[in-house]
């Protein structure tokens, strides 16, 4: 099986070997001829060659793009044929836009059985040539000689076509070197006229050729002149013709122009042959004229000069002169013409001519200067006669003559002097011109006036020359505008003064020629003194006259010399110093000088003429020098002056060349002067260059922006050569350095709101150039009122329209040159009234008047009225809401009638210390250390009791049983207000008591039985009685939150049927608890079914260690204090806003297993052992204590002591070690079950309560002043306005029945309810800012009165002393109630009576937002009394009893220091029974704790005198002896650590009051032992179902021996 395959393999191998031997000559194919790339035209045949060899002969196949090519072998109809040689032949190339089957890359493959061979790639491309040229050549137009370029881009094609050009249908000869074809561009470098023609671009490739569009080359010819104009010289009034002929292609246009100006209007014409003809040529027609030939290719110019030959005319004519014998005289003669005429002199009758270029002869006394002046020296009598001056040029000649008179004796008098000449003026048409000319001289000068060089004709009636020389022109016309010259002449010479006068049509006020105030013009300077003299220079000095006139700003120097003429010449001006060197004087000449001072207002009178001064003589020239030769050679010197170079605004550089030098050139004189019509023919200024080789110089100190004419002249000593030609140069401009003058602003008559602004240009020397424009700013008091105007430099007025009336505008004007605007003028103010008339400065109203005008505007009055109306409406709305809120509270009081346990006190807000103190609705302590915070009942409460004598009850007596008339009468049964005025005598400080009574009397006489607060079974004849029928002190009810009212109302209906049965067994004692009313009400509901009590419920408030105040940390809804009984007219400052917070949300959940509560039946106290009935009202300290061991005899001097209010508003400051004897009736909803437990006998045996921390609350405000030592009553019942005022007498029986029914109910002690302090957070806020239960007071007179009672209410007051409890007990005694006293036994076995104390709880309805909720508190059902005396049994409805609350964690608050030291003052503190009694009482209660709610009223037991560091020492501290009673002996207390931290929360225990021997620190947790108190209860059957509001439970009070002790309290 294995060998059989091997046979097969062997056989195959043999066959293979035998086959290879048979075909050894075969070889695989190879390509011999590869195909090549082809470019073929569409539709043309093509062949792709491919040749291969091999054995056997290989077969050839073609592939295109990787796919086999189909040939005729595959398809006979195919246009592709495979030739035998292997080549691929295309019959025609198929090529379309969408289908290109033949184009591509081909390969040929040769195969045989040995293999295959592949050729190279060969591409077959289809040649194309499109028809459209990518760029056709465009027409070109060039001038002869310019290059011409034609661009062409052939159409797209493959292969790329080549370009050639045709001209006029023939191929272009590119052999011409001027023609270049590159990249399709045809370029002809230098065109000729023969190159013009039509050109075509031709594109060619294998497909064919394409021709572009025809482009034409146009060759134009620039203009050229056939005949040019030539220079002409003609005389004046002749005609001048300039010929001009030009050619070009196209034919050029020909025009003429004058290089330096315009062609003379109406005197020239251009003929058809382009010839320019000027008729009546004038001298102004001289210049260069240019013929301009221009066509579309270019232009050509040809110029010619016209010279106008002007006959000479005299500029200065000689005048007759009188000269003394032997003197020198000069005749001036100056002429101009074109060319410059020659001047020569001759004496009439003589043929001898004297020329200016003639050298002077030493023997001759006659000479002619270069300027043409004839000078005769050493005049002789034979020189008398006429002398003729003649001028001559090619245009003509003129002559003039002057007479010389020679006298024997003649003074060398100067010419006259013009003291005051005319000034430039601008007047309105029909105005009057006054031109003054005051001249002095000897003899008196003759004054002549010329206008523009022509004598003014006086034949015109408008023109008159006065004798003084003044020229007066009335009714000025526009034609009177011109330059006026005053000439003053005498035989010795003349003086001239010119001014320019302009007459305008409108708006130019008449200006006086000189300022009317002479102090504005400088006075004449002093006589000039000569300090230095040279050949050509004289130096002068002078002093200004500062005694009168204004201070000069510059000076003008004038000089006179007979050698220079017969008139005064201005030698220098604008001289800034008092010393000046005058240059350019003639040698060997006598000169006189005078000086004038000048400022902006004018020129002063001339100074005195200086002494004559003679310049030095010319130094003699070298010997042998011929003067004639010097003059001749200087005359042949020719200077060529170049165009000056402008260097700056005040300097110019001048260059010149000398054509022919001379040895007699000593230097050059550069003469320059301002040119232009405005400057006139001013004198030439000379700048000498004494270096002959120098050919340039810089002329300094030129005026800015002025056009100067400059020329040069060679000189040699006194000899001078010919002048060069004149050149012009203009210095650079600068902004004017002075403002325009005489700026005026006036009302424009044409427009009601337009003004006219006029001005004069700045002084010429300050213009610093040509004024091109004036800028006018009209600025209002706001940007939107600004108006700017710009006018040209020749305009001196502008109208500014559209001014806003009432706006004060300031107008400023500034001149502007090419360098910019210059200095602004002084602002001119104008204001238009509502009628468009200018308001004078006197008429401009003051600011107060403007305000008054605004106030009188109807719109303003309407706006004020609308604002007042809005304010009134807002106030009305606020008042309505305020009253509505009060009415809402009043309507809520109606519910108080239904619930006897509700008490509410409206408030009056006072302002004390700059802050709001609200007494309404803010429960808290009454701090005697804070003055002026006592709340008052607003007198707006109606007093319905008309007979106060019947029912008024005076709380306190003055110690003798008489009522104090200074106190307000109260009429609330069983309530007492202590009169402390008689107790303090000299201890009342800072009292802010009102002058009159502010209490409202509430009349309860008509319907006392309807007063639900008193409608209890124990109410009899208007007095409260206990079950045994004895009158009992009234215990007020307590406020609760508004959110409890609904629950109370709902549970009132069935309250009588639901009885709570306390457990009979006694339960172990637990730690005292403390909580606030919110926690109590909230938590008791949850634990109503549970019979256990949490150990501690902290108060939700924090304590201030400085003030003893407490901070309220709850946020309860209440109404504002401002809505509760404000007194009319009382100012209620706004209380500071405090952020509200709902602190109830922060309370933790109750514990799962609260501790059990005490058995209330353990509470046993005799009601019979009560206070004595006669007790004077004590002075309440703050905090007030009830001291034990007071003498019984003190009770006889006191009035009834009201029950102690709840003083313990801060848990950290109070420890309750005595149980209160006040039995207060809580409502079912606020069953204070945890509070009805006994405190330990002594807190010293009680371990420290756990450290509690309080939540920080808002910081307290600054401390308040000390309160006065008066405590005012608080009404604890419904308002009189809410009661029926007509209670009948017949309802007394019903009251008796109710009293009988209530005897079966047990009296429950009111639980201690901590009052949340206000959000202000200090003690004052918890005292005056709280609404607390008030106390009424009963006087002895009311014991026998009817049931009527007048109820007075005071808001926010609070008793903080134990005397308040004594007052209540005394009131109960007065009312016929038997007050029980508890007999105690101390440690030594001694028995004594201990007065029961129970501080009145504070109100729970104060909130952080200073709101007081009106809460209807339901009466707690009276408890059934057991048979054993002294014990109380609780009887309540199961559904209404709340479970004990869970104690939340204590919240710690930061201690806030008081900002002011409170006043130290003595206070009256009642003494309590001895400590032994308390010890004994504590020992009696060790067996169990009381479960009753008798101890719910707490009191703060603090004494500011106590040292907080050692409570035991504080206990042993003796009385200071200031009390009225006898001090009790000191007793030792069991040692106990009773101090708690100031921030600790103390457990609740029934409060008592420390003795004077045992004061307590406010921060200490009191170590006093607690003492229970009970009420004597009698069993009463037939307890029916009653309204909860009618169930009042009265508390019994024990008698106690108490004394008042005066304590000093210090608060820091």
Curated annotation (Swiss-Prot):
The entry's keywords: Cell membrane, Cell projection, Chemotaxis, Developmental protein, Differentiation, Disulfide bond, Glycoprotein, Immunoglobulin domain, Membrane, Neurogenesis, Phosphoprotein, Receptor, Repeat, Signal, Transmembrane, Transmembrane helix, Ubl conjugation
Residue list for modification Phosphotyrosine: 999, 1034, 1075
Post-translational modification: Ubiquitinated. May be deubiquitinated by USP33.
Listed transmembrane segments: 859-879
Major subcellular location class: membrane
Membrane-related topology note: Single-pass type I membrane protein; Single-pass membrane protein
Region feature Disordered, mapped onto this chain: 1045-1068, 1088-1298, 1313-1358, 1381-1612
Residue intervals of the Ig-like C2-type domain: 29-125, 131-218, 223-307, 312-407, 416-502
This protein's GO CC annotations: axolemma; endoplasmic reticulum-Golgi intermediate compartment membrane; plasma membrane
Gene3D superfamilies: Immunoglobulins
Biased composition (Acidic residues): 1283-1297, 1603-1612
Modified residues (Phosphoserine): 901, 1016, 1258
Compositionally biased region (Low complexity): 1108-1124, 1345-1358, 1563-1575
One BP term from GO: positive regulation of gene expression
Places the protein is found: Cell membrane; Cell projection, Axon; Endoplasmic reticulum-Golgi intermediate compartment membrane
PROSITE patterns named among the record's database cross-references: FN3, IG_LIKE
Protein name per the record: Roundabout homolog 1
Naturally occurring in which organism (per UniProt): Mus musculus
Gene: Robo1
